[in-house]
């Protein structure tokens, strides 16, 4: 792939600067948590109006990484059409609505986190709650807290297993969960 833009968190600045140099990336923005004057936030405030370009359903929208059924990571070329129909089909199957609030514990650089667990919810107007890093106790706390209102939770097997082994699992209120699912294991 030939990346054109890199948006990165300040915690990865050293690695990002090496990538920018090594991959000849011409555009970059650093996101700093809790800094409303970060490069990223300033770009959002001062950015130019978005100009759409003509595209087709077959045009690529992103390159995602997946281990698929083999367990070995590989780049998957995702077209506009694939992303759209994936969001529609998974959203319909899981009964996703604009009232859905999904807890996403998988990374968004991976197709599971983005295309299976985030995009279908966003496509239907729902909300996505992202965990920066998975912690079984914190995930149970988020699910248990009515202020978050989590209605859906999908993940690979490991997070489910870790949550079930956590001491707070038995006392967590799962009554608001309308949909849960597991997938992605070889």
Please state what every model-predicted region is.
Residues 1, 6, 8-17, 43-44, 66, 106, 134, 148-186, ...:
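Adenylate-forming
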Residues 84-101, 109-151, 161-162, 166:
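Conserved AMP-binding/adenylation subdomain of ANL enzymes
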């Amino acid at each position: 792939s030939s990346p054109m833009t890199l948006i990165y968190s300040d915690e990865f600045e050293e690695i990002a600067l090496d990538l920018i140099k090594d991959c000849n990336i011409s555009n970059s923005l650093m996101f700093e948590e809790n800094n409303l004057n970060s490069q990223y936030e300033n770009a959002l405030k001062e950015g130019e109006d978005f100009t759409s370009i003509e595209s087709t359903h077959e045009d690529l929208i992103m390159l995602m990484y997946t281990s698929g059924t083999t367990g070995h990571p590989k780049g998957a070329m995702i077209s506009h059409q694939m992303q759209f129909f994936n969001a529609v089909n998974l959203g319909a199957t899981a009964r996703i609505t604009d009232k859905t609030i999904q807890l996403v514990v998988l990374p968004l650089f991976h197709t599971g986190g983005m295309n299976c667990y985030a995009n279908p919810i966003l496509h239907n107007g729902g909300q996505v709650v992202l965990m920066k890093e998975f912690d079984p106790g914190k995930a149970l706390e988020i699910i248990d807290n009515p202020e978050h209102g989590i209605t859906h939770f999908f993940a690979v097997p490991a997070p489910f297993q870790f949550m079930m082994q956590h001491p707070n699992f038995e006392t967590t209120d799962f009554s608001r969960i309308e949909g849960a699912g597991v997938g992605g294991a070889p």
